[in-house]
């Protein structure tokens, strides 16, 4: 059994939506990133890669590589899943915490869980997504960006 932790942050930038957990959410900012900026799927990918001792997303999908410009993070996550399966691991469960002052996440969480479960090839009850604020403290509280913590448990079949 292996446990991995992932963490990612993206700052807000000009735009009118963000993508989190594969869900497009209307917002008065976008997220600054080389790919689609899905900070949730980036943190989750790092947690999975870390648990399998396969490095991090920067190693597999460098932001200096033009092929990943604007990349769909769901496609990247599916590639990560293929890598961990190739190493003989299966996913036990994943737990994700979105840290954001805005926008409100509650209306989108069940859709995020369903999309993530699909991409991970696991049951819905193996995927948790929750959200919290920082009570207006720090860069998140000032609405300068969004952070996500992810934990993944891998097991041998």
From Swiss-Prot:
Gene Ontology biological process terms in this record: isopentenyl diphosphate biosynthetic process, methylerythritol 4-phosphate pathway; terpenoid biosynthetic process
Cofactor dependency: a divalent metal cation
Listed CDD domains: MECDP_synthase
Pathway, per record: Isoprenoid biosynthesis; isopentenyl diphosphate biosynthesis via DXP pathway; isopentenyl diphosphate from 1-deoxy-D-xylulose 5-phosphate: step 4/6
Pfam families: YgbB
Reactions it catalyzes: 4-CDP-2-C-methyl-D-erythritol 2-phosphate = 2-C-methyl-D-erythritol 2,4-cyclic diphosphate + CMP
PANTHER family: 2-C-METHYL-D-ERYTHRITOL 2,4-CYCLODIPHOSPHATE SYNTHASE, CHLOROPLASTIC (PTHR43181:SF1)
Designated name of the protein: 2-C-methyl-D-erythritol 2,4-cyclodiphosphate synthase
Annotated gene: ispF
